[in-house]
Regions:
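Solvent-exposed loop/turn segments at secondary-structure junctions
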Residues: 17, 41-42, 83-86
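ADP-ribose/NAD+-binding catalytic cleft of ART/PARP-like enzymes
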Residues: 1-36
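Conserved NAD+-utilizing ADP-ribose enzyme module
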Residues: 61-180
Length: 180
């Protein structure tokens, strides 16, 4: 989803930031980089998979590849320039075809971050990370492919479009489906 000027994309993050995340302001920077997905892809996923879900907190945790006992409470949609977005994967260009291979990584800050995130994801936490640019859906369903994931290293260029508590976000998605 692009803004009217065609310069920014609308991404979505699920979080527990203390900041109220008011529309018009930047996404808070206290949590480090922003892990996000496409609002358009989330909306399409909801249209196809919403039936039968009784615990949305758990289902979103599974879909987005985060622990089921996390404290995620709100979804925030935000505008950002594609130039400020990378793919948290072997190849960082979010517009290029994804290729699998550690050898693609060049020495430097991103490779250092990548290596630290592997250690953190697989040895220090319960956050599965595919390293392929998509979330790991651990629901046990038909596919382990969740949604395309993006990383915004610096929130300074973001502009919040909306913030909804998880239950209200589900209602918002339902309204979008009824409008379609």
């Amino acid at each position: 989803i692009w803004d009217e000027s065609g310069e920014r994309v609308l991404l979505l993050t699920w979080h527990d930031y203390e900041d109220p995340c008011e529309p018009g302001g930047p996404v808070p920077s206290g949590g480090g980089e922003i892990w996000a997905t496409s609002l358009g892809e989330m909306t399409a996923w909801y249209e196809e998979h919403h039936g039968g879900v009784t615990d949305w907190d758990l289902r979103f945790a599974q879909l987005l590849g985060v622990p089921g006992d996390g404290d995620y409470t709100r979804f925030t949609g935000f505008w950002v320039s594609p130039a400020d977005v990378i793919r948290p994967a072997y190849g960082t260009d979010a517009t290029a075809q994804m290729a699998n291979g550690y050898g693609q990584l060049r020495e430097g800050p991103y490779k250092d971050w990548f290596d630290r995130n592997i250690l953190w994801s697989y040895f220090e936490s319960d956050y599965p990370w595919t390293r392929l640019g998509y979330t790991y859906d651990w629901s046990g369903g038909e596919s382990e492919y969740g949604l395309t994931e993006f990383l915004v290293p610096d929130s300074g260029g973001t502009e919040i479009a909306f913030t909804y508590p998880t239950d209200e976000f589900v209602l918002w998605l339902e309204d979008r489906q009824e409008e379609a």
